[in-house]
From Swiss-Prot:
Family note: Belongs to the CysZ family.
Species this chain originates from: Escherichia coli O7:K1 (strain IAI39 / ExPEC)
Biological processes per GO annotation: cysteine biosynthetic process; sulfate assimilation
Membrane topology: Multi-pass membrane protein
Entry protein name: Sulfate transporter CysZ
NCBIfam families reported in the protein's UniProt record: PRK04949.1 (NF003433)
Record-annotated membrane-spanning stretches: 31-51, 75-95, 151-171, 222-242
Free-text function comment from the UniProt entry: High affinity, high specificity proton-dependent sulfate transporter, which mediates sulfate uptake. Provides the sulfur source for the cysteine synthesis pathway.
GO cellular component, one term: plasma membrane
Cellular compartments annotated: Cell inner membrane
Length: 253
């Protein structure tokens, strides 16, 4: 069945909202199950443990606030909580995406076929097994691009004043961009688009992708909703691929 999606690109907020609609479509739900289970088990357990540790971590982070900023502590404390949620949420989201990468790719492929009426290459368990080495190599490429930038931003958290004010904002912007890369990469990789070429393509619509990544990042911090965010974001990113990038980069039609 071909969807009513048009080639006219929309905002990143639109595509994120579409992800929630597309994830429950008949014929797509069975491809959602495995990514959903991985995310529920990992993110659910991780955030349960996080909330048992917040009363230790937040005072430690606030101890880096210099004396001349103590009068702002009532504002910096919420920023410290948000910082921990952002870093922690992105870290475990990355692990979940590594584990579920083959199934996320399959979900993106099947949804694209439904939205466009195109015929994808052979799929199924044997197709997934054949593609696992390529998929994991792609995940390593993303990790290698992400890690040095993340380390620089994490170091900022330990600089008095900057770590409690500027660093959370920079980390949020960085995680928004990285989550856009993470989820948009599944349909790009299904068409064997090189990682560097994919990043160049995303930069041509940077505002749209930042909007999409920002909402994904926010929902990753929200308990319960974050359990469902992985398949939702895959579906939203696939809808964006169909509207904005497929005409130029598709390998199969």
């Amino acid at each position: 069945m071909v969807s009513s999606f048009t080639s006219a690109p929309r905002s990143g907020f639109y595509y994120f909202a579409q992800g929630w609609k597309l994830v429950s479509q008949p014929g797509i739900r069975r491809f959602v199950i495995l990514p959903l289970l991985v995310n529920i088990l990992l993110m659910g357990g991780a955030f349960w443990w996080l909330f048992t540790q917040l009363d230790v971590w937040i005072p430690t982070l606030m101890s880096y606030v210099p004396d001349w900023l103590q009068w702002l502590s009532y504002l910096l404390w919420p920023l410290a909580v948000i910082s921990v949620l952002l870093v922690f949420g992105y870290f475990f989201s990355t692990i979940a995406n590594w584990i579920a990468a083959p199934f996320n790719g399959l979900l993106a492929e099947q949804l694209e076929a439904r939205l466009t009426g195109a015929t994808p290459p052979d799929t199924g368990i044997f197709g997934i097994m054949k593609d696992v080495p390529r998929i994991m190599k792609r995940e390593w490429q993303k990790f290698a691009w992400y890690l040095p930038r993340a380390i620089v931003l994490l170091i900022l958290y330990f600089i008095p004043g900057i770590g409690q004010t500027v660093a959370p904002v920079l980390w949020f912007l960085f995680s928004a961009w990285m989550l856009a890369i993470q989820y948009c990469d599944y349909p790009f990789d299904n068409h064997k688009v090189p990682f560097k070429e994919m990043r160049i393509a995303l930069r041509t619509r940077k505002i749209t992708n930042m909007q999409f990544g920002a909402l994904t990042s926010l929902f990753t911090m929200i308990p319960l909703l974050n359990l469902f965010i992985m398949p939702v974001a895959v579906c939203g990113a696939t809808a964006m691929w169909v509207d904005c990038y497929r005409d130029k980069h598709a390998m199969w039609r």
